[in-house]
């Protein structure tokens, strides 16, 4: 049996990746609509061996459609997601708009798939922030074993997390380094991103943290356990795709590195590559196009009781966005739609 699926924002980085993943995972699609704003109307996108033309989101009727995967900004989501939901179409939203609404589930299927039942509240399910998604996949199985008290995370986030404009800016600035006549000043980012790192993602909050850092705190609590203390420093780095995170974890109970490694090896969505030798770890460039969240550099933290350090890498356009959304859709099909 197939289902009627709409991809909203099909011409963007995440929207195109959603189409790729729907095809790769052989999602049971009966009818597929690719939607975009009027300025992108008629743009062609690929779905498997098919070429589809985008339709106008503004005039699209969601009645009779099963699932809409939203890959647009919060403003467009605010306008169109309620329309789709009211028509009886489940919205899986990749923006930040609904993540902190207590009535809307925030789901990472490897972690809290049971929260899918909350779809009944508003017919909307939220996708987490890219940096949160990969981290909680690593944290949850360890939390189940030894109960996490506190997490300290520093992120190394690629420019694709800022959209196509971020990718273009890194590319243009990198070229201009070798051609000073064609200087490219910052537009998307606050400072030059080429050959640089920027400790600033999203807007600053009153306490000195950034919105990106606040998101990691709030979302980890909502997805995993509200009792976990989290502090984050989020940094933009000159990498096109793939986010990395250095994570320090303090547990209630002792958990040695060997047991942690074994637990993670058996955990869904996780790939452990952790050899104590040159190259025995995963870097962002190696995770591009992969579904897994890669874990390396697992080791005890000798400065605290019950502490561990690890390195976490994932494709932010996949697990951090498009893949997670499709996985949520799979849970909805398997647990809800197929039972009707």
Name every feature range the model reports, one short phrase each:
Residues 68, 159-340:
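Charged docking surfaces used in two-component/phosphorelay signaling
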Residues 1-193, 229, 293-294, 298-304, ...:
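N-terminal Rossmann-like NAD(P) cofactor-binding subdomain of oxidoreductases
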């Amino acid at each position: 049996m197939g289902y009627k699926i709409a991809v909203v924002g099909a011409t963007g980085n995440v929207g195109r990746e959603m189409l790729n993943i729907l095809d790769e995972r052989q999602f049971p699609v009966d009818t597929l609509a690719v939607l975009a704003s009027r300025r992108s109307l008629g743009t062609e996108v690929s779905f498997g061996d098919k070429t589809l033309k985008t339709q106008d989101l503004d005039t699209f009727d969601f009645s009779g459609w099963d699932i809409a995967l939203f890959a647009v900004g919060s403003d467009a989501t605010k306008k169109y997601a309620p329309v789709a939901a009211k028509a009886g179409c489940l919205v899986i939203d990749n923006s930040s708009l609904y993540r902190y609404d207590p009535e809307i589930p925030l789901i990472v299927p490897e972690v809290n798939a049971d929260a899918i039942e909350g779809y009944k509240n508003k017919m909307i399910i939220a996708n987490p922030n890219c940096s949160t998604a990969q981290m909680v996949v690593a944290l949850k199985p360890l939390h189940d074993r030894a109960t996490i008290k506190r997490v300290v995370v520093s992120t190394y986030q690629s420019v694709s997390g800022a959209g196509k404009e971020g990718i273009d800016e890194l590319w243009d600035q990198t070229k201009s380094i070798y051609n000073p006549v064609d200087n490219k000043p910052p537009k998307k980012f606050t400072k030059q991103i080429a050959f640089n790192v920027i400790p600033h993602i999203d807007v600053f909050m009153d306490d000195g943290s950034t919105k990106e850092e606040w998101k990691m705190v709030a979302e980890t609590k909502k997805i995993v356990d509200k009792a976990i203390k989290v502090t984050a420093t989020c940094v933009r780095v000159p990498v096109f795709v793939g986010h990395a995170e250095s994570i320090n974890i303090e547990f209630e109970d002792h958990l040695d590195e060997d047991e942690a490694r074994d637990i993670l090896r058996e955990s869904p969505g996780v790939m452990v590559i952790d050899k104590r030798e040159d190259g025995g770890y995963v870097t962002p460039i190696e995770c591009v196009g992969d579904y897994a969240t890669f874990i390396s550099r697992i080791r005890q933290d000798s400065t605290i009781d019950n502490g561990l350090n690890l390195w976490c890498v994932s494709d932010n356009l996949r697990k951090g966005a498009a893949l997670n959304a499709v996985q949520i859709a799979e849970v909805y099909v398997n647990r809800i739609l197929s039972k009707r």
